[in-house]
């Protein structure tokens, strides 16, 4: 059996929207089972996985097309994408030369980082995938290209160089301050929005917990990136997204 490109894309998005946590079980019991009537022909699981690589570019383009609305209020953050358990780092061959050891507040991991920028409606504006040891601030200029307004982030994004670079392009970086730093005055609405950074943590939690973004069963780097981008596309199609207090959205801001 053969599937056209759109059917393969649909299957990947359907997986993220389904209750299945494992793609193999989803394909065998879902695609070849309860959803079988949706497709004229269905190849076996092994054949589908062999041809998944061709979906990478279409999914990357789809993710770009589902980009959120330019609202002037944005949030930036990153999250780890571990590709194996720490005990198996030395034996991992699938991502050799690609994945790197990184560290978060929860400890060390081996894999990649997903960097993300969203607007205040929790719509994804930009994503970047980097090795796990990449500084969170490094991808921000490329991700923020074309964005105007204010970008809220945590203390890990503090950088005068980054602030100046974004400021020249019409985007103000607003972060919390470290204990050793001198306090500075912020407009009250900026202070409120800085405290609302949990919205991007909610988006990352939705990607990981609900849509199954992170797992350690990948057998191919290309298929791993297909999985990541299909997850981002599935999120873009979600009709219900986290929201900030509507009273804040009513302000003509920034």
PLM segments and residue spans:
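Short alpha-helical elements
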Residues: 1-254
């Amino acid at each position: 059996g053969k599937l056209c490109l759109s059917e393969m894309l649909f299957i990947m998005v359907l997986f993220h929207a389904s209750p299945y946590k494992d793609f193999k079980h989803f394909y065998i019991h879902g695609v070849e089972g309860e959803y079988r009537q949706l497709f004229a022909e269905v190849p076996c699981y092994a054949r589908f996985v062999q041809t998944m690589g061709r979906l990478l570019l279409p999914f990357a383009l789809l993710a770009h097309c589902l980009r959120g609305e330019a609202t002037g209020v944005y949030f930036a953050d990153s999250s780890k994408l571990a590709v194996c358990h720490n005990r198996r780092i030395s034996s991992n061959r699938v991502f050799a030369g690609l994945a790197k050891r990184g560290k978060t507040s929860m400890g060390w991991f081996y894999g990649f980082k997903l960097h993300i920028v969203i607007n205040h409606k929790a719509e994804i504006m930009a994503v970047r995938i980097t090795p796990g040891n990449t500084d969170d601030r490094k991808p921000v200029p490329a991700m923020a290209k074309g964005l105007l307004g204010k970008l809220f982030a945590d203390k890990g994004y503090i950088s005068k160089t980054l602030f100046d670079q974004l400021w020249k392009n019409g985007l103000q970086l607003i972060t919390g301050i470290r204990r050793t730093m001198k306090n500075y005055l912020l407009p009250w609405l900026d202070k409120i929005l800085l405290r609302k950074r949990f919205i991007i943590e909610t988006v990352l939690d939705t990607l990981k917990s609900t849509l199954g973004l992170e797992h350690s069963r990948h057998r191919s780097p290309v298929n791993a990136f297909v999985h990541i981008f299909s997850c981002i596309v599935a999120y873009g199609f979600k009709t219900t997204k986290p929201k900030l207090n509507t009273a804040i959205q009513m302000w003509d801001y920034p």
